[in-house]
Amino acid sequence: MHPRIIPALSLKFPPLAIFFAQEPPSDAKEMRSLCSMLLVAQAAMGRTMAITRGTCRCPGAGKGLGLEPSNHGTIPGGGECYLHFFPTRKQDLEHGHTMIQKLTVGGASQTMTDDRSGREYLYKTLEGMVQRPGHLPRLQPEAPYVVLKPLEALVPDEKPKVVSLLIEPDQLPALVSLSDRTRPGIDRVWLPFTAGCASMVLYPLHEAERTNPRAVIGLTDTSTRFYLRKALGKEVVAFTVPWGMFVEMEETISNGLIKHCA
């Protein structure tokens, strides 16, 4: 497939097909990483990346990539430790010490363990954080691997669940407009408050199951931007859509619309 949207928007990076697989594709590269965003960067450079539960040392990556159920009780230190991560100092909790020790044993970098032992200040109160898990999509993993692959490199038996476009902010208006052209309403795009991996995989997968799916703007998480800045630059955001929605957008590309928006 040669997407029309690439020349229309002069995309710097190839659209990424994201799908599940029982086995890694023959052209896939498997590598361990601290953060899944480093693997996203590899895919953006044209490589096929196959990710499984043990690939990333970040304890939230398996959930954000749809490889584990959204159950935060399985995070090192337990659910209580997770809840206290954002609004309070986890190093003051017994569970917090457990999580930090497990991360260290697992080979996490000093940067990551220092980050997890402090605060992210994303929630003002614990009460706000307690409500967060109830808003997360509940998806069951479809296969052991999630694959990130340039859309143009797909072989006939590979079909993406979602497609992610890594774009610059000036290209966002065109994609928002394309998303809203074919269906009524004004809520075809949203930006969830979530991790980078979840914004590219978990939430778009959830949207793919809805009757009226939405595009998901992502890579707005502060940690995500730290890991991607060196590899892809500081201007990159993600615009991820279910496969059917991407096909609709491809069919309705308007040169006039692109000229005014991109």
Regions flagged by a language model, labelled:
Residues 2-262:
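Acidic, serine/proline-rich low-complexity intrinsically disordered regions
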